[in-house]
Amino acid sequence: MLTAALAELRGMGIEKVFVNGDATSEARPAEVRRFAEIMNTFGAPERQWFVTRGNHDRPHKPDADSSAGYDEFPVLEGTEDHRDPFGVLLGRPRQELWVTQQGPVRVIGLDSSKLVESGGEISPGQFDALEQELQRDPNKPTVVLAHHPITSEAGWTNAAGPIFILNSADARRLQQLLNDAPGVFFAGAGHTHRAKRTRGDFGAGVDYLETGACKAYPGGYTLLHVYSGGYQVNFHRLSSEDALAWTARARWAMYGFEPEALLGELSDRNYVVNRVIA
């Protein structure tokens, strides 16, 4: 699915790709290396492609899978015996943000993964770094990416409930930081596999979107086209024969309810927002 997505994006002339977490199944070293190998066919890391950490990419103890090779990596500082192939191999230390400038737009990637659970959190240190970055230029047009959704609406409407998203205290603090920076216009999430646009808990300046999964149903990618008068969001289903066959098979997960739970409304997948971006 990832190979098919990159081929389509390359054919469309897309120059930058952002993978918003869950790049692997369980962050096994072989999985991380294979992900990087596939992505490097598109371009150079930190230049043509960027990745945040999802819950599946979190550190693991060697006894989680004795044959995976976790024990070849050093013990993660501050943990009993967790190893972090994702962080080591991709140069993404746990709970550290990254920033890249794409034309007039600043893109900030957050690590919202917990050490051992599927829900999300943001460390005090990462919050401090985010606040400093936003305050450095609060009016700069900014996109923020984090694997876990952060709105109450996202928590109460996803199948697993509020425990599945960013914890409530961190979600409130993150929304406040984004709301206090007038340049932040878009906050993208993954995790739920669905296409779903939700309202923030306060303020109306930030657009919160969960994008549909690539690896399974609904099987696609989301394009964000930013221009001086606003931006356009479009979800594209993968069109290769193998990708369509897998998507058709994957739609029967969740007892056949995946289309109802994950595809979302047309307005969740395709829309335009008019605002000044300069």
Label every model-predicted segment.
Residues M1-P29:
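N-terminal active-site segment of His-dependent metallophosphoesterases
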Residues A7-K16, Q101, R106-I108, E117-D207, ...:
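His/acidic metal-ligating clusters that form di-metal
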Residues G21-D22, G54-N55, H147, G190-H191:
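Active-site glycine-centered loops adjacent to acidic/histidine catalytic or metal-binding residues
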Residues S25-R28, R58-P62, V116-S118, T151-A154, ...:
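Short catalytic/ligand-binding loop motif for oxyanion handling, primarily in non-cytosolic enzymes
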Residues G183-F186, G190-D242:
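Active-site/pore-lining binding-face segments in mid-to-C-terminal subdomains
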Residues Y227-A278:
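A short C-terminal boundary segment appended to hydrolase-like catalytic domains
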